[in-house]
Amino acid sequence: MTLEITAAMVKDLREKTNVGMMDCKKALQETGGDLEKAVDLLRQKGLAKAMKRAGKEASEGMVHAYIHAGGRIGVLIEVNCETDFAAKSEDFVEFVKNVAMQVAATNPLGIVPEDISQDVVERERAIYLAQAQESGKPQNILEKMVEGKMRKFFEESTLLQQSYVKDPDKTIQDYLNELTASIGEKIIIRRFARFQLGSE
């Protein structure tokens, strides 16, 4: 019997290593859900380079405010890193500003899929299932169609999975990984809030 890898386990490993969700899930599957072994495995693969300071908290960083489109859209974002030195680096500051612009442009529902309310996810799934059922295809094909549409939904509505607007060949997660590798510190997009004139 294989252990089910839960979203909470993946999120926990991701917060420890700052490695992408799929790599975290794969590492947990390969280590039977053992968090410490999964951390070691990611380090061996070179994915968790910033883990050489595993005990260090990402408590530095910056909060940035971005106002777009003549004052009609505003974003507040908090991005954390481990040291004040990194927080003041040009690359880090540019990253925070670029991610704030991304949020303004794309209006994500969360940073990772787990941030999106279950109600929203279930509603999307129900809509996609109803659409798929109209095709008259067998149940196993319907499930694959729905899974494909849900994957696309998360790619469009979660910040880390979105294509980066300034370089659509990579995701925000790729951009974050590149910065993590170049400054050698854990970086976490902690939270954001997007405001649009006239919307709730």
Curated annotation (Swiss-Prot):
It comes from the Bacteria. HAMAP family: EF_Ts. InterPro entries: EF-Ts_dimer_sf (IPR036402), Transl_elong_EFTs/EF1B (IPR001816), Transl_elong_EFTs/EF1B_dimer (IPR014039), Transl_elong_Ts_CS (IPR018101), UBA-like_sf (IPR009060). This is Elongation factor Ts. Associates with the EF-Tu.GDP complex and induces the exchange of GDP to GTP. It remains bound to the aminoacyl-tRNA.EF-Tu.GTP complex up to the GTP hydrolysis stage on the ribosome. One of its GO terms (molecular function) is translation elongation factor activity. One of its GO terms (cellular component) is cytoplasm. The keyword Cytoplasm applies. Residues 83-86 are annotated as: Involved in Mg(2+) ion dislocation from EF-Tu. It is found in: Cytoplasm. Belongs to the EF-Ts family. Pfam families: EF_TS. Keywords: Cytoplasm, Elongation factor, Protein biosynthesis. The keyword rRNA-binding does not apply.
